[in-house]
């Protein structure tokens, strides 16, 4: 893994530091990206939410995923787009009441993600 991708964003008038981790969805192997934020009280990275969503019947390329625009803070998505970490493919898929965009993640972003197997000590430094 390269240097971890870290951003700062505002949510409900509070500033948060965020890092990202990757795994895969069990049913289809699609890329999962989660968001963690630095907890000032516990002084460690804690799960915050999902950047991606798994849509039924969809198989994505290894560097692609559908963004969870229903639950992820819009500022996180905006920052990642502005930094060139995600690129809109122009493809969308509906699920429930939402329409989710398919994005392509940059190699730099993917190389800066922690994996679920990474040691906590390495991650929390």
PLM feature spans:
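Catalytic phosphate/metal-binding cores of nucleic-acid and nucleotide-processing enzymes, i.e., regions
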Residues: 4, 11, 17-38, 42-50
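Acidic, aromatic-enriched beta-alpha/helix-loop junctions
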Residues: 34-84
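Short, compact, well-ordered microdomains
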Residues: 69-120
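A generic structural micro-environment signature
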Residues: 26, 59-61, 92, 111
């Amino acid at each position: 893994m390269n240097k971890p991708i870290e951003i700062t964003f505002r949510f409900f008038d509070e500033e948060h530091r965020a890092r990202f981790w990757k795994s895969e969805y069990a049913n289809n192997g699609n890329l999962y990206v989660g968001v963690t934020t630095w907890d000032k009280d516990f002084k460690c990275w804690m799960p915050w939410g999902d950047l991606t969503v798994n849509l039924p019947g969809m198989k994505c390329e290894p560097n692609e995923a559908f963004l969870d625009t229903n639950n992820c803070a819009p500022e996180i998505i905006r920052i990642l787009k502005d930094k060139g970490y995600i690129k809109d493919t122009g493809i969308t898929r509906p699920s429930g009441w939402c329409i989710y965009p398919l994005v392509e993640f940059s190699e730099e972003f993917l190389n800066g993600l922690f994996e679920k197997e990474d040691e906590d000590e390495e991650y929390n430094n």
